[in-house]
């Protein structure tokens, strides 16, 4: 498949008047092969603590295999998504950048080497990660609480 549906729960937590930026708590819930499977998972999550208190914070995004800032060719997912991200802590918040979604670990590694040279990430060279997610397998199995 050339595309999958990425499901996240992105809850607003704070606004900084100093920087005029919003902070969110974002949970990656999984990658799904169809819009219907994504919607079915939302219904399951709505039964869990935390999620049912913030029912409007679910977001679906279509992601294509092997496309990023360096590659425009669409590949084929084969049961897994290899997710390339960059994360660093600025002293107050974790900052996460979604860099790409790949059909193979090797394709993700190739793009990672390109991103390492990007001035935006050069000060945090250890912040890169490549994680494998099985398509149609929920990644978050419990609810959550807020305080």
Across the structure, where does each feature detected by a protein language model lie?
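Short aromatic-glycine-(Arg/Gly/Cys) micro-motifs in beta-strand/loop hairpins
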Residues: 1-28, 70-98
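Short regulatory "switch" loops immediately downstream of catalytic or recognition motifs
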Residues: 8-16, 44-48, 87, 113-118
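Short, mixed-charge low-complexity intrinsically disordered segments
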Residues: 26-27, 44-81, 114-147
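Hydrophobic/aromatic beta-strand elements that line small-molecule binding cavities or substrate pockets
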Residues: 30, 62, 100
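A short, hydrophobic secondary-structure junction motif
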Residues: 31-41, 136-139
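Conserved aromatic
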Residues: 32, 102-105
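Short amphipathic alpha-helices within nucleic acid-binding modules
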Residues: 37-43, 106-113
């Amino acid at each position: 498949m050339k595309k999958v549906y990425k499901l996240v729960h992105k809850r607003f937590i704070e606004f900084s008047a100093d920087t005029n930026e919003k902070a969110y708590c974002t949970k990656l819930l999984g990658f799904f092969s169809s819009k219907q499977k994504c919607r079915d998972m939302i219904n399951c999550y709505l039964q869990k603590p935390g999620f049912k208190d913030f029912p409007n914070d679910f977001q679906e995004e279509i992601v294509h295999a092997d496309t990023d800032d360096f590659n425009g060719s669409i590949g084929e997912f084969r049961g897994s998504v290899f997710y390339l991200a960059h994360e660093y802590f600025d002293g107050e918040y974790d900052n996460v950048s979604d860099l790409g979604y790949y059909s193979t670990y090797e394709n993700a590694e190739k793009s990672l080497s390109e991103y390492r040279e990007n001035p935006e990430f050069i000060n945090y060279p250890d912040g890169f990660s490549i994680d494998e997610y099985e398509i149609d397998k929920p990644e978050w199995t419990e609810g959550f609480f807020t305080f």
